[in-house]
């Protein structure tokens, strides 16, 4: 699975979103109804899946599907 596919799967699993709703421009909060706890859990799942550390100030910037994919690709 590609990084993009793995990130999308985590988003579907963590937020209960439909796979077809998880597009690059999709916002976790505005489009998928995530709250701040959901986004924290999402970041933790990304850290675990990709064995990376995402500092809080960086985690706050991860608000869309594409921003999550970009962060993982740039920090692996």
Curated annotation (Swiss-Prot):
Residues 1-76 form the Carrier domain. GO terms for cellular component: cytosol; membrane. Gene3D superfamilies: ACP-like. Belongs to the acyl carrier protein (ACP) family. This is Acyl carrier protein. It comes from the Bacteria. The modification O-(pantetheine 4'-phosphoryl)serine is found at residue 36. GO terms for molecular function: acyl binding; acyl carrier activity; phosphopantetheine binding. One of its GO terms (biological process) is lipid A biosynthetic process. PANTHER family: ACYL CARRIER PROTEIN, CARRIER DOMAIN-CONTAINING PROTEIN. The gene is acpP. Keywords: Cytoplasm, Fatty acid biosynthesis, Fatty acid metabolism, Lipid biosynthesis, Lipid metabolism, Phosphopantetheine, Phosphoprotein. Its main location: cytoplasm. InterPro entries: ACP, ACP-like_sf, PKS_PP-bd, PP-bd_ACP, Ppantetheine_attach_site. It is found in: Cytoplasm. Carrier of the growing fatty acid chain in fatty acid biosynthesis. 4'-phosphopantetheine is transferred from CoA to a specific serine of apo-ACP by AcpS. This modification is essential for activity because fatty acids are bound in thioester linkage to the sulfhydryl of the prosthetic group. Signal peptide: none annotated. Pathway: Lipid metabolism; fatty acid biosynthesis.
């Amino acid at each position: 699975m590609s990084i993009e596919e793995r990130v999308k799967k985590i988003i579907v699993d963590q937020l209960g979103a439909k796979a077809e709703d998880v597009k690059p421009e999709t916002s976790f909060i505005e489009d998928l109804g995530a709250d701040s706890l959901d986004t924290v859990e999402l970041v933790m799942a990304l850290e675990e899946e990709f064995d990376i550390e995402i500092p809080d100030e960086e985690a706050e910037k991860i608000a869309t599907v594409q921003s999550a994919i970009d962060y993982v690709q740039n920090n692996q």
